[in-house]
Amino acid sequence: MMNSRDSITRRELLQRLALLTGATLVPWRAFGALEPAPSDKLGPVLPLRPLGKTGLKVTMLAVGGSHIGRPPESEAQAVIEAAIANGIRTFDTAELYQNGGSEERYGKFLTPKYREHVLIFTKTMAEDAATARNHLEGSLRRMKTDYIDLWQLHDVRMMDKADVRVHGVLDVMLKAKAEGKVRHIGFTGHASWKTHAHVLELTDAFETCLMPINVADPSYESFTLNVLPILLQRNMGAMAMKTLAADGLMGGRGGTGPRIIPDRLSVHEALRYVWSLPVSTLVSGMASVAHLKANVASARSFIAMSEADRQALVAKVADVAQSGEMERGFKGQTGS
């Protein structure tokens, strides 16, 4: 595995990307990155992708729940309704978001009408069994459902905490799965690929992983180069977040950093790059209907990039991305 803090040349970066695509994307191509867009009782559905070994099929675009809990309730309801109307059937959230507020909005606007048609994912920040069980029961209650499709260990950051959290919570997750309260289990994090790799060394029980994947990632502390191959080897569902580097590609939240978008590439190109990798879904925080519709348009017009085009896009931003500045808002944030 590479140490992304080491300075690497453009040629070395492209060689590493070529090794990734050559060694790990063959199985992905074999079972197909996309299925034809289906329809259900609610209307046309976005193209589906398999979620690793879970047997679930997820829409290539998923709603990120943190943004559902932020705006006024009427706007959150509008985003949920627009997501359904535009073919999204995969919804992610977490017990942490707005202290359960995001889950409550799913329970108010999503599950009463659409539960049988959607997949709902949530997460727990628990470090011990009792807290994990309380979080699970609270999530089920707030979302007004008797099962969760994917329950995830949320935001695993520090290496030593990873041991504590996995050993403290995994048995509860497995028991909840046996009880039918959750269908599948996974873990998430965005601070350190090394911690992700450590979690994967601790256990093979997790079925999915949600992590940062974006055009800047291969150049700095890369999840794509260091974790994605392991997920593919284990047939785990790889899910992408921070696909615009938490706005880091657009100068950051304050707009003072380097602007990759729109100076060097478009939002559509950035999303297309991610979808061209072997990810099951792209989880996006979409706080407005307009934002959601723009992302849906990119999904519906998606044509996979060639290996050469992916490498060219990474190389196009590598000189800025190698410093890590664009991703500093989440990578390396390993505090408890």
Model-based region annotation:
Residues D92-F109:
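Glycine-rich, proline-tolerant flexible connector loops at the mouths of alpha/beta enzymes
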Residues G52-G55, G107-R115, S139-T145, L200-D204:
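Acidic (Asp/Glu)-rich catalytic clusters
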Residues L51, V63, F91, Y106, ...:
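Conserved, mostly hydrophobic/aromatic
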Residues L202, T224-S336:
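Structured C-terminal cap/extension of enzyme domains
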Residues W28-L61, I68-G69:
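C-terminal segment of N-terminal export signals and the immediately downstream linker at the start
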Residues M2-T21:
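N-terminal secretory signal peptides and thylakoid transit peptides that target proteins
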Residues G64-S74, T122-A130, G255-P262:
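Active-site mouth loops of central-metabolism enzymes
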Residues E127-M239, A290:
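Glycine/proline-rich, positively charged
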